[in-house]
């Protein structure tokens, strides 16, 4: 992770590849802690500012995918001014504020779904 491009490649591998290859299973989220660790390192080194604007979000998605409100807040701060990213970030953050987790992950992670979460999911609740 010596370069912005190296960080980008690593974070796509850790964050996006599992989400697309192991959809619906716990494996989809297995590398999230590593992705978040490396995203923190990349941002600390301002690597997210060194990639093309269209690619920047791939360096930041581990914050948006985290179930910790602090990471959600950090994502929102990092994408401030980008209306499209702010829109999606708000959907993620609002879900964490409301439930403390992403209910659409419950089945894959073997978590019990609360009645409020089930109602949210039944109404088409955010599943990003």
Predicted regions mapped to residue ranges:
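Surface/interface-facing alpha-helical segments and adjacent flexible terminal/loop regions used
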Residues: 1-9, 17-128
């Amino acid at each position: 992770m010596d370069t912005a491009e190296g960080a980008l490649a690593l974070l796509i591998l850790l964050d996006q590849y599992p989400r697309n290859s192991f959809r619906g299973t716990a494996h989809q989220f297995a590398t999230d802690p590593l992705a978040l660790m490396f995203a923190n390192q990349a941002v600390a080194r301002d690597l997210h500012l060194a990639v093309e604007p269209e690619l920047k979000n791939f360096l930041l998605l581990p914050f948006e995918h985290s179930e910790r409100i602090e990471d959600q807040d950090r994502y929102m701060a990092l994408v401030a001014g980008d209306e499209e990213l702010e829109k999606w970030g708000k959907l993620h953050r609002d879900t964490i504020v409301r439930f403390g987790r992403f209910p659409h992950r419950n089945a894959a992670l073997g978590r019990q779904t609360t009645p409020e979460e089930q109602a949210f999911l039944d109404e088409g609740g955010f599943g990003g």
